[in-house]
Amino acid sequence: MSECYSFVVNGVPCSTEEEKPLLRYLRDELRLTSVKDGCSEGACGTCTILVDGKAVKACVLSTKRAAGKEIVTVEGLSEAEREAFVYAFGAVGAVQCGFCIPGMVMAGKALLDQNPNPSEAEIKKAIRGNVCRCTGYKKIIEGIALAGAILRGEASVDPALEEGEDYGVGARAFRTDVRDKVLGRGEYCDDLYLDGMAHASAVRSQYPRARVLDIDPSAAL
């Protein structure tokens, strides 16, 4: 009899009989594509989620080890948290390509849940396992700090800044895709799921100047 692994994802009980990386279950079964697959080996942090309140990389946690745990992704943030992070990251310019941002947000949430008013050094430590190739981290650090201030009630949200009511030369403005990228709704190629979708992988010869005489496709069928 196969074993069943049960856990709670964003408040919803889930279970599976298949032991595999939690990342694959969240993306392929639940379609929670805010959990990005940047490396599949725990190096980049784009798949950062909360597991029992702690920041964890979903690609290195199996469904078996996740059994009995409470899991939260960006989709499971409260309305107040979503609005705080969207505004903060947009206001400081923390979003560029956006691929790393949901993981940064979850690392930031894990910190703010434990320490609502962190120092810059504490924010840097909290995101040390998250890689960003665009921003140089400064804006992301500022974004987490501002999100914390908003959630503490020490900073306010200016809706006009996001809505762009007074755009003009030299005016501050959000990127138009900030909300989707912060909340993990921006679609990248790997986020597309189609019925009957096939996958391909490049296979290269181990030998230089080798001539391919035959291909056995049985493993792929």
Regions found by a protein language model. Give the residues of each.
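Flexible, low-hydrophobicity surface segments
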Residues: 148-221
